[in-house]
């Protein structure tokens, strides 16, 4: 009875890249469902090849690849018939009534052109910085856990959980240093609840509450990475030293 299967190309919180071609083939071999992938996080970060992905629908949002806010696109494979989203005029092939936002559309098109011209160079550069930052954190800050795939991961995403320190505390104290990070997705910013994504991968308790997401850009530098890790080390050390459970843990784990 399923009419639609929708799977993220890459997760917005932990950066894991899904095996979309294989998943799409599996769905189509076992049903007549339309297959949609949400490529909002992935477009402009990794190569997107519609023909190889084998999808019926693909959506992306311009602000994720340095385009205007409030505009995106939906790829519809030829032969897939969709009803009108709302009734009125016949704009956008009769799917979405209303006057088109031409400046935003043109801006999105130009942003897509520019980001694809430098995609591989940008992706490789961010991957190197991402791996460098992960290495420094894992080597210099004990009791941390990298969330998501280490290999099949967006080049700009680092999601790490730290035991015995609250993620929101890290966010606030880094913000005071002029460093912007988040304790979850941008959609849930400001909510002091454990991310459902983090819970779904099995993290609980102190480790789950200590989750922080770092997002890089094509403008991020190695110097900024070093400054961030140095500030992060100091913040976590100071806050752990104020946590009685941390000292009990250390006492119980002395060899």
Tell me what each language-model feature is.
Residues 1-255:
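Pyridoxal 5′-phosphate
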